[in-house]
Amino acid sequence: MISNFKSISLTYRKAPLEIRERVALNEAECKSLMLRIKDFTDTAELLILSTCNRTEIYYTSNEDYSNDIIKLLGVEKNITGLIQQKEYFEIYNEQADAVLHLFEVGIGLDSQVVGDMQIVNQVKYAYQWSADLNLAGPFLHRLMHTIFFTNKRVVQETAFRDGAASVSYATVELSEELLSATPNANILIVGLGEIGADVCRNFKANTSFKNITLTNRSPLKSEALAAECGIEHVPFETLWEAVAKADLVISSVAKEEPLFTKEEIQKLSILSHKYFIDLSVPRSVDARAEELPGIIVYDIDHIQNRSNEALENRLNAIPHVRKIILDSIVEFNEWSKEMEVSPTINKLKNALEQIRKEELSRFVKQLSDEEAKKVDEITKSIMQKIIKLPVLQLKAACKRGEAETLIDVLNDLFNLDKQPEQIRD
């Protein structure tokens, strides 16, 4: 009997940030939790995906272990009474629902930013961690590779991944365009609001820029983020020295008056161009700065227009994306149904092989080596032809949803319940 595929999901859709932060898991914690679940349940296949927007556990079992898994998650994160917050979790106990959900997550349909490009790699990491612990079996291997192939189709056949659909992504995308002809470009990020932090992380995840510097009035958080992203941190007191070195300045400073005034910028030695991307409201870069030679400023409206256009393209592509997903799920379900009859097919092959070997053993001593070899080949060929039709009929019955009756008939005819699934030598 093939176990049901299920999922427990805590995401931005139902759970506030403070809850998501508490249950978020790193690689070591994901692996530790998978081993806990394996020890306390009968599940054979497990996958845990944890990002800033979701923590999800996928598992195979005919039992509903959602309560147990939530409790084990609480133990892993040292959260007392996590089960009391079960209303924040979505439970997918039907295989069709869990499979569809993982497809939508892996493709980016369920992301807070539709078409999120990071999620594919995050899913790949989760799959790798599962495989590292031998907790990815035939079902999960096939499912994950089907999702990865589906993602390639979505990229090739739709506009779902085109452009940057968030302000932070659009900022990184624009930066790449502006600095494409500038070798070893220097980028300075000023301010650490929510957008500034997202920009830092997106630079780390999606670009090859090496010379990125961060500065902020309050150094504690910015030093930690700089360490997380592997970028340089400089004191805010040295701001203008850093600005002088930068080819691009990205500002998300919360300030009533512009931090970067025309007068201060005018003091800089501008040899060619210096770009400012101003993500602040009110603006932190003086609107008059563009009057200066070599100074080019992009404000939040420009960035927002880029992200809005990309988001509109992605939303328009969703019907096509859903069709591609459904095509893949149909194909996966056909394979999954065939998996249900695989044990019966193996047992039938084993039963026939036993009969063949027993009969051969009665006569082989009377034959020469050459004769024995020929008889062995002939009987193997006969067996393969005998078994071909039942196998084809079983697979056809799978597609019609009628395999159970045929399985029962074969079990009775050949006493398959007593046969092992593996063919013995």
Swiss-Prot record:
Q: Binding of substrate: at which residues?
A: T51, C52, N53, R54, S111, D116, M117, Q118, Q122
Question: Please, which domain of life does this record's source organism belong to?
Answer: Bacteria
Recorded metabolic or biological pathway in which this protein acts? Porphyrin-containing compound metabolism; protoporphyrin-IX biosynthesis; 5-aminolevulinate from L-glutamyl-tRNA(Glu): step 1/2
Please report any disulfide bonds recorded for this protein chain, giving both cysteine positions.
none
Q: Which InterPro entries match?
A: 4pyrrol_synth_GluRdtase, 4pyrrol_synth_GluRdtase_dimer, 4pyrrol_synth_GluRdtase_N, GluRdtase_dimer_dom_sf, GluRdtase_N_sf, NAD(P)-bd_dom_sf, Shikm_DH/Glu-tRNA_Rdtase
Q: Where is this site: Important for activity?
A: H101
Q: What class of enzyme is it?
A: oxidoreductase
Q: Which reaction does it catalyse?
A: (S)-4-amino-5-oxopentanoate + tRNA(Glu) + NADP(+) = L-glutamyl-tRNA(Glu) + NADPH + H(+)
What are the protein's UniProt keywords? NADP, Oxidoreductase, Porphyrin biosynthesis
Q: Which Gene3D superfamilies match?
A: Glutamyl-tRNA reductase, N-terminal domain, NAD(P)-binding Rossmann-like Domain
Q: What Enzyme Commission number(s) apply to this enzyme?
A: 1.2.1.70
> Catalytic center at which residues?
C52 (nucleophile)
Q: Which Pfam families match?
A: GlutR_dimer, GlutR_N, Shikimate_DH
Any one Gene Ontology biological process term?
protoporphyrinogen IX biosynthetic process from glutamate
Task: List the GO molecular function terms.
Answer: glutamyl-tRNA reductase activity; NADP binding
Residues reported in the UniProt entry to bind NADP(+): G191, L192, G193, E194, I195, G196
**Other noteworthy facts:** During catalysis, the active site Cys acts as a nucleophile attacking the alpha-carbonyl group of tRNA-bound glutamate with the formation of a thioester intermediate between enzyme and glutamate, and the concomitant release of tRNA(Glu). The thioester intermediate is finally reduced by direct hydride transfer from NADPH, to form the product GSA.
User: How does the record comment on the protein's domains?
Assistant: Possesses an unusual extended V-shaped dimeric structure with each monomer consisting of three distinct domains arranged along a curved 'spinal' alpha-helix. The N-terminal catalytic domain specifically recognizes the glutamate moiety of the substrate. The second domain is the NADPH-binding domain, and the third C-terminal domain is responsible for dimerization.
By its UniProt entry, which HAMAP family does this protein fall under? Glu_tRNA_reductase (MF_00087)
Outline what the protein does.
Catalyzes the NADPH-dependent reduction of glutamyl-tRNA(Glu) to glutamate 1-semialdehyde (GSA).
Q: Which NCBIfam families match?
A: hemA
**Subunit comment:** Homodimer.
Describe the family membership recorded for this protein in Swiss-Prot or TrEMBL: Belongs to the glutamyl-tRNA reductase family.
The protein depicted here goes by the name Glutamyl-tRNA reductase
What species was this sequence derived from? Cytophaga hutchinsonii (strain ATCC 33406 / DSM 1761 / CIP 103989 / NBRC 15051 / NCIMB 9469 / D465)
Protein encoded by which gene? hemA
